[in-house]
């Protein structure tokens, strides 16, 4: 029996917000829009409805190692405990924000919040936006905002080059959006709501050196990266490690995604930030390994097949960086680590 606990009203995580077509491989639904991939995966789960239950609008609030149980809350009033023989932590990531004066004025959003408003609830967060960050998320959300009729005043990026795929950058550049490299936001303008922002040039040490420029906008969208959400793994006593290539603290794991706590597995962005296609493969690896550990029959050779798919997804410069991070946390023999 499998229990899936989902904090949102609808399963699918970030996929339900994604209206663009995914890259990757055919096995991971390349060329399919994110929200449609979520439907495909949900149909796959529903085909095992006698074995899989989904708790929606439910948050796992903590793990208590001494009792070997989780606390969870559904909605705002129902609290209960969960016990499991094996646990896969696929909690994803949380948005990073940056400090600047007036960043608490209404109208400053994370990119994920903007996607939720537009693509889930059909609400425009503003009419003219300053996008902070030119990674894939910043570029994709900029394009989605423009598709919805929002004007993108500019995209500012602190690094000396665009961090996302050039295909995404080219789309918004063709539509007249300037991408200002070695620039960042200095302060937001406004009192009760955002009326503009001041941006500034940066030197090679990321220090503000000017010139400054005022941007008129009613929305500031922050897209400066993600950090793995790993609180449950830490509470379970899993060996953690800070790995810059994986964007934060992550759990050490073996090829089966098993952590130093033999009853806990990790998958997806909780184990390091990369594409959704890799998260889907890691989820299959973790599920296969957990089932095998419980004594259920599994297909021989599947683990090697899934690792081969991961390697094909982790090509290029970004993939090489991720592979470096994986090498830091991958453990061949937990017994050897325990006795080291």
Residue ranges and their predicted role:
Residues 1-340:
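Residues forming the flavin
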